From Swiss-Prot:
InterPro entries: Xyl_isomerase-like_sf, Xyl_isomerase-like_TIM-brl, Xylose_isom_bac, Xylose_isomerase
Needed cofactors: Mg(2+)
Protein family: Belongs to the xylose isomerase family.
GO CC aspect terms: cytoplasm
Result, substituting A247S: In strain: NRRL B-4449 and IO-1
Official protein name in the record: Xylose isomerase
Main enzyme class: isomerase
Catalytic reaction equation(s): alpha-D-xylose = alpha-D-xylulofuranose
Biological process (GO), any one: D-xylose metabolic process
Residues reported in the UniProt entry to bind Mg(2+) 2: E268, H271, D307, D309
Cofactor remark: Binds 2 magnesium ions per subunit.
Result, substituting H416Y: In strain: NRRL B-4449
Length: 439
């Protein structure tokens, strides 16, 4: 059954259009920085926020009008309808990738065995849809935070039985990734951390988390399907202190446990804000360590201190993010997954399409602005000029080429230390000109 017959496929109509159901900036065929927008922006739809989110919150019940959930039948019947609705939305938008948690797509049933069977049935349906539409699986993951058994985490749980149950979920998830041709597999450790250090052996828990990841790698190799593994950092919520706190913390963990050759990072805007970082900072950190894998596209609310997962509309923030992504040479096999939910007051089914249009237009604007910054060498020239003392002075060259010693540097300071001339950063000017690049 079709749920959006009254909405035509979304097309690019430019900024003069008055059509709500049209792209004003995202033109998939437009060439930017040597590639089409569609090639530069591997957009993906998130099954959970798009299809299963009902608008309920701690203060009120469901608000969303979701016709695919109102037709009766079994939970499996509803799951099949959700797949149909999801792919219809993706086709309307021209989005080529999607992502899901295991419990998003299939009912968990009354046992793990029943859950496996439900997943098999629904992924048969997903595979049919993929073949019919050409839409691909960007990544999947296991929800290991909602069920009460995971209240203390999975690999970091104090109960070995919970560790085993989580392994069973990931084992199945990797099998489904192979079945559906997934290019990445995500771990988000929402409850992998500690509530209080008073009763926590942090070192032991992190050792166990590393063992869990190595077991996942071993199993992926055994089934001849080794996707790019992605860790998604977040500092808190739901756990008080999560072990994958931010990009730098996650990278330190991966390096310590010899996981860095298998893992990259899946970075989210709102998670960066929760740490107190900009999204640009997190992307730059990952890029510096050659670990930028994929991103979750959303934004928070500057006035709120939690993960609001709003659709991205802040052009300057996303332009700076796209600048880092372009400097990285793109996202490779990663993509731009809209881990974003419509506000509970945007309750019409059509709002799902309108919200994704807004997000896709924002990233298209950001792409054009970031490409212009790079083409004009606006920021790169400023950065190069700022560090010229390491190229144009004898002492700077000695530091760069490794011939400097503390003795030679001290001798230089004794002779010239009172003559140092500092440079102004002119940061206000830079920020002012940056605004000229916002599309």
């Amino acid at each position: 059954m079709a749920y959006f017959n009254d909405i035509a496929p979304i097309k690019y109509e430019g900024t003069k259009t008055k059509n709500m159901f049209a792209f004003r900036h995202y033109n998939p065929e437009e060439v930017v920085a040597g590639k089409t927008m569609e090639e530069q922006l591997h957009f993906a739809l998130a099954f959970w926020h798009t299809i299963t989110m009902d608008g309920s919150d701690p203060f009120g019940g469901a608000t969303m009008e979701r016709p695919w959930d109102l037709e009766g039948g079994s939970e499996l019947d509803r799951a099949h309808r959700r797949v149909d609705a999801f792919f219809e939305i993706a086709e309307k938008l021209g989005v080529k990738y999607y992502c899901f948690h295991d419990i998003d797509i299939a009912p968990t049933g009354n046992s793990l065995k029943e859950f496996y069977a439900n997943l098999d049935e629904i992924t048969d349906h997903l595979l049919e849809k993929q073949k019919a539409t050409g839409i691909k699986l960007l990544w999947n993951t296991a929800n290991m935070f909602s069920n009460p058994r995971y209240m203390n985490g999975v690999s970091t749980s104090n109960r070995a039985e919970v560790f085993a149950y989580g392994a069973a979920q990931v084992k199945k998830g990797l099998e489904l990734s192979k079945k559906l041709g997934g290019e990445n597999y995500v771990f988000w450790g929402g409850r992998e951390g500690y509530e209080s250090l008073l009763n926590t052996d942090r070192g032991l828990e992190m050792d166990h988390m590393a063992k869990f990841f190595h077991l996942a790698i071993d199993y992926a190799k055994s089934i001849n399907h080794l996707p790019i593994f992605l860790i998604e950092p977040k500092p808190k919520e739901p756990m008080t202190h999560q072990y994958d706190f931010d990009a730098a913390t996650a990278l330190a963990f991966l390096q310590k446990y010899d996981l860095d050759k298998y893992f990259k990072l899946n970075l989210e805007t709102n998670h960066a804000w929760l740490v107190g970082h900009t999204f640009e900072h997190e992307l730059n950190t990952a890029r510096t360590f050659n670990a930028l894998g994929s991103i979750d596209a959303n934004q928070g609310n500057y006035l709120l201190g939690w993960d609001t997962d709003e659709f991205p509309t802040l052009v300057i923030d996303i332009t700076l993010a796209m600048h880092q992504i372009l400097l990285n040479g793109g996202l490779g096999k990663g993509g731009i997954n809209f881990d974003a939910k419509v506000r509970r007051t945007s309750f019409k089914a059509e709002d799902l399409i309108l919200a994704h249009i807004a997000g896709m237009d924002t990233y298209a604007r950001a792409l054009k602005g970031a490409a212009a910054i790079i083409e004009d060498k606006f920021l790169s020239d400023i950065v190069d000029e700022r560090y010229t003392s390491y190229k144009n002075t004898e002492v700077g060259q000695s530091i760069e080429n490794g011939t400097a010693t503390f003795e030679s540097l001290a001798a230089f300071a004794l002779e010239h230390g009172d003559d140092i001339e500092l440079d102004s950063n002119h940061l206000e000017y830079i920020k002012s000109v940056l605004n000229d690049y916002l599309v």
